[in-house]
Every structure is written in structure tokens, then in C-alpha cells.
């Protein structure tokens, strides 16, 4: 990857707010009654239109995200049909799926339908995971990441800072991510919501910048993507993340929160002298 290239990725929340897990950081859990938009299936035509818009906004990747524990037969079929439609309409965008815990066989099926990359975040350290989720295990998540690689998919796995974890937890998570040798690593910062058990993100802006730098030290060759919580965490200094080692951004809206206008990101990145990457594998 070129030192001067910045990679942009967009996400589509194709099934929202229907998850029965108890992840304390996530408004998509039905357990917390957060005031978000909830729906079972987004129309595939709408997903295709979002993909077209994402590519027009210079995104090289487009992620199909479903709320829920993992893939069942109906959800797998839906994601595959969506992938087929997007691939046909926007063949030059790299397709990513983020559908929770998945088996090797399910991931092979996604690959058959044009999915190139599977996103499944470790979220935090193994030893801290029970503090933020009790309905599935960290080991379940790690195994899914291994399954994705075994199925021949590129792996995208990262985590969230600001959940109350210790510095030792952060280092442990980064070491675990590095052990998986992913292609890309999304770094999220907890976005508080009054409905969630986690009350606030204790990180300062400087601590967050230092964590980006720390992540890069453990992941020297990966696409390091700043994702959820970027605007809230960094404000007007958000593009300084590149000085600390990041080389990718999620553009547009996030799963349940609004993002910055994509053109504003493009203008800011190019004004700093960076080049927007045209493909994931440059």
C-alpha cells in the first residue's frame, strides 16, 4: 500500500436493530430499546443505489451489514442476493460482508456470490470480553475470523476503544488482531447513547490519537481504518489520524449514527496532499 493513498469504504445497514445479543456498546440490541431505525430487510434496489452512491463518492469497498448473532439460511440467501445485485450494478467496488458469527461453509457460499472480504471485529481483548457481552464468546468471534481466511476471503477485523478497557486490554486485542494477519483493521471509538449500559467514553482526544499510533505499531502493513466515532472523538482534528498511522476512513453514515458528508471527507483528504485510492488492492 502506498504511503500517500487513503482508502475509503462505505457501509450499508441492510438489516437494522434486530439483534438479540447483549453487547453493551451496541444500539442494535433489542435489549436496550435505543431510539434507532429498526427493520428486517432493506430492499435490494435501495442497497444497489447506496452502492452506486458509495462508488461515486470514491469508496473502494462496500459492506453489507446485518444485525444479529450470525448467519442462518434465510439471512445467508438475502445477503447473497444483495451481493449478486450490487456486483452486477457496480462491478468495480469491492464487496464486504459483516454478518456476525459464520461457519466455513457459509463463508464459502458468500465468496461464491462475489463477497471478497469478511468483517468480523474482535471488539476488545479476550480477557475483557465478558464485561461487554455475555450472550456469545470472544472465542466464537476469533473462530469466525479464522473461518473467513480458510474460506479464501480477505479478513477485516478490528475493535472498539473507550469501553472501559485497560491499556493492557488494548494491547492484548491488538496482538490478537495481528495474529490473524487481516487485510484491514477498523478502529472504532465508543459512541455513547443514553439507552446503553455503558454511560460514556472516558478517552481524551490525545489518548485516542495515541491509540491509533499504537494500533499502527502492532499492524504495520494493514489498512488501518478509522470508523465509528471518528467525528465525535476527534472533531475538527479528525484528519490528523493520518499523521498517527491511519490510512483509511469509513465515509458516509455509520450503522445507526450519521457521518460526515462524503464530499467533505474527499475535499479534506485531497487538500492535505493525499491521493484517494481507486481500488482496495493498490
From Swiss-Prot:
General function of this protein: Catalyzes the conversion of dethiobiotin (DTB) to biotin by the insertion of a sulfur atom into dethiobiotin via a radical-based mechanism.
Cofactor note: Binds 1 [4Fe-4S] cluster. The cluster is coordinated with 3 cysteines and an exchangeable S-adenosyl-L-methionine. Binds 1 [2Fe-2S] cluster. The cluster is coordinated with 3 cysteines and 1 arginine.
UniProt KW keywords: 2Fe-2S, 4Fe-4S, Biotin biosynthesis, Iron, Iron-sulfur, Metal-binding, S-adenosyl-L-methionine, Transferase
HAMAP family: BioB
Cystine connections: none
Pathway: Cofactor biosynthesis; biotin biosynthesis; biotin from 7,8-diaminononanoate: step 2/2
Pfam families the UniProt entry points to: BATS, Radical_SAM
Single GO term (MF): biotin synthase activity
Chain sites annotated for binding [2Fe-2S] cluster: 63, 98, 156
Any single biological process term in GO: biotin biosynthetic process
Binding site for [4Fe-4S] cluster: 19, 23, 26
Keyword Cytoplasm: no
Catalytic activity line of the entry: (4R,5S)-dethiobiotin + (sulfur carrier)-SH + 2 reduced [2Fe-2S]-[ferredoxin] + 2 S-adenosyl-L-methionine = (sulfur carrier)-H + biotin + 2 5'-deoxyadenosine + 2 L-methionine + 2 oxidized [2Fe-2S]-[ferredoxin]
Radical SAM core domain boundaries: 1-230
Enzyme class: transferase
Complex and partners: Homodimer.
Family statement drawn from the similarity comment of this UniProt entry: Belongs to the radical SAM superfamily. Biotin synthase family.
EC number: 2.8.1.6
Source organism per UniProt: Aliarcobacter butzleri (strain RM4018)
UniProt gene name: bioB
Cofactor(s) needed for function: [4Fe-4S] cluster; [2Fe-2S] cluster
Protein name: Biotin synthase
Amino acid at each position: 500500500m502506498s504511503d500517500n493513498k487513503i482508502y475509503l469504504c462505505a457501509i450499508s445497514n441492510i438489516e437494522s436493530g434486530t439483534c438479540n445479543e447483549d453487547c453493551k456498546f451496541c444500539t442494535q440490541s433489542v435489549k436496550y430499546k435505543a431510539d434507532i431505525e429498526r427493520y428486517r430487510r432493506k430492499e435490494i434496489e435501495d442497497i444497489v443505489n447506496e452502492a452506486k452512491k458509495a462508488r461515486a463518492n470514491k469508496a473502494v469497498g462496500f459492506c453489507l451489514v446485518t444485525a444479529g448473532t450470525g448467519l442462518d439460511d434465510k439471512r445467508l440467501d438475502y445477503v447473497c442476493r444483495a451481493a449478486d445485485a450490487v456486483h452486477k450494478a457496480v462491478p468495480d467496488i469491492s464487496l464486504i460482508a459483516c454478518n456476525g458469527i459464520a461457519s466455513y461453509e457459509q463463508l464459502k457460499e458468500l465468496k461464491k456470490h462475489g463477497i471478497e472480504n469478511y468483517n468480523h471485529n474482535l471488539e476488545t481483548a479476550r480477557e475483557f470480553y465478558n464485561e461487554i457481552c455475555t450472550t456469545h464468546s470472544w472465542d466464537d468471534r476469533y473462530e469466525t475470523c479464522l473461518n473467513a481466511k480458510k474460506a479464501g476471503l480477505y479478513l477485516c477485523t478490528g475493535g472498539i476503544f473507550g469501553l472501559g478497557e485497560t491499556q493492557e486490554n488494548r494491547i492484548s486485542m491488538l496482538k490478537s488482531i495481528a495474529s490473524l494477519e487481516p487485510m484491514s483493521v477498523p478502529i472504532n471509538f465508543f459512541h455513547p447513547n443514553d439507552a446503553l449500559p455503558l454511560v460514556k467514553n472516558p478517552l481524551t482526544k490525545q489518548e485516542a490519537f495515541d491509540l491509533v499510533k499504537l494500533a499502527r505499531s502492532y499492524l504495520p502493513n494493514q489498512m488501518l481504518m478509522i470508523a465509528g466515532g471518528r467525528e465525535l472523538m476527534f472533531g475538527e482534528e479528525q484528519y490528523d489520524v493520518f499523521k498517527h498511522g491511519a490510512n483509511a476512513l469509513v465515509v458516509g453514515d455509520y450503522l445507526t449514527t450519521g457521518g460526515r458528508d462524503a464530499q467533505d471527507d474527499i475535499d479534506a483528504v485531497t487538500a492535505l496532499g493525499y491521493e484517494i485510492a481507486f481500488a482496495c488492492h493498490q
